[in-house]
């Protein structure tokens, strides 16, 4: 592993202004955009990080997730997909519901697909139909356990 192991490839420069209105100043009570250069360290051991720095190595890190000020895709022309994998966990329907609500109401994405039964739902030979996820479909799913999409392992 080296410092480029977890780099995320991009499709091009993000030139569209994000439709969500966030802050720029820490401590103003408004969630801030994430800058592209923000990273999360892979290694949590202080001694290991110091060793990398002394050897003039860039510590291994992940791109920090979160909303960006500029985005690549035009939300009104975007289709989004959600898939749940690796088994069930508490609150999965809450996560699905939150993603749909954020995409639909904050970003303006109108076509959101839910792929059933984990990665199998992405493979045509299994013939698992996708579910069109709208605010109406997901309105009360947080009241139920499991995942509206199902899941699979392996």
List PLM regions with ranges:
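Metallocofactor- and cofactor-centric catalytic cores in central/energy metabolism, strongly enriched
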Residues: 1-154
């Amino acid at each position: 592993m080296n410092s480029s192991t977890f780099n995320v490839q991009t499709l091009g420069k993000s030139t569209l202004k994000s439709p969500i209105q966030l802050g720029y100043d820490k401590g103003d009570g408004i969630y801030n955009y994430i800058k592209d250069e923000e990273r999360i360290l892979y290694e949590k051991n202080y001694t290991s990080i110091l060793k990398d720095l002394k050897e003039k190595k860039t510590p291994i890190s992940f791109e920090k997730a979160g909303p960006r000020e500029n985005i690549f895709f035009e939300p009104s022309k975007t289709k989004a997909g959600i898939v749940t994998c690796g088994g069930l966990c508490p609150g999965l329907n809450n996560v699905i519901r939150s993603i749909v609500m954020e995409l639909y109401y904050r970003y303006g994405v109108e076509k959101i697909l839910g792929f059933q039964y984990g990665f199998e739902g992405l493979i045509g030979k299994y013939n698992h139909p996708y579910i069109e996820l709208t605010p109406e479909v997901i309105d009360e799913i947080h009241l139920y356990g499991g995942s509206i999409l199902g899941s699979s392992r392996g």
